[in-house]
């Protein structure tokens, strides 16, 4: 693919636009160099999980649950709720959690809590067991307030003047 036909701009959602980059010369690397790049990319995924976890107590749990819904073939992808959840998940991926990557305010989901409860309850049992819950109801009791209640974790970092930075 020539440089002139390569599309650097990719997907756009919410207030974000994804950019793509060319890895010039990647094809010329030796097999051992390509393996090294592969294992570095695997390490970045672990680092991403660490960052996501550090940005909020429930961020990994939320991301893994949203990913399970996103990849479940039984979920109807044509609904407005699914499309809203897809944008929310992409924002979670980009920001490593449920708060804006620089504004630190919590994302407002564009899918209903009723829909979310229904699709999570319909997931295979091993999905919620893998994240440490014995039932979908127990998982939803933790997730729904964090995702849907604007008073729960409204900001990742509060730097407002006069506010107790530790307590808030």
Features from the language model and the residues they span:
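N-terminal helix-rich structural modules
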Residues: 2-168
């Amino acid at each position: 693919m020539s440089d002139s036909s390569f599309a650097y701009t990719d997907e756009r959602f919410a207030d974000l636009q994804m950019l793509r980059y060319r890895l010039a010369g990647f094809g010329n690397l030796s097999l051992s160099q390509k393996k090294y790049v592969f294992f570095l990319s695997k390490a970045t995924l672990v680092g991403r999980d660490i960052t996501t976890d550090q940005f909020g107590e429930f961020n990994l749990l939320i991301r893994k649950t949203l990913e399970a819904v996103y990849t479940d073939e039984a979920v109807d992808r044509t609904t407005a709720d699914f499309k809203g959840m897809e944008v929310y998940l992409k924002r979670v991926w980009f920001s490593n959690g449920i708060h804006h990557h620089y504004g630190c305010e919590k994302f407002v989901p564009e899918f209903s809590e009723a829909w979310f409860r229904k699709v999570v309850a319909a997931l295979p049992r091993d999905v919620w067991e893998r994240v440490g819950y014995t039932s979908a109801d127990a998982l939803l009791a933790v997730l729904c307030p964090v995702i849907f209640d604007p008073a729960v974790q409204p900001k990742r970092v509060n730097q407002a003047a006069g506010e107790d930075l530790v307590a808030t």
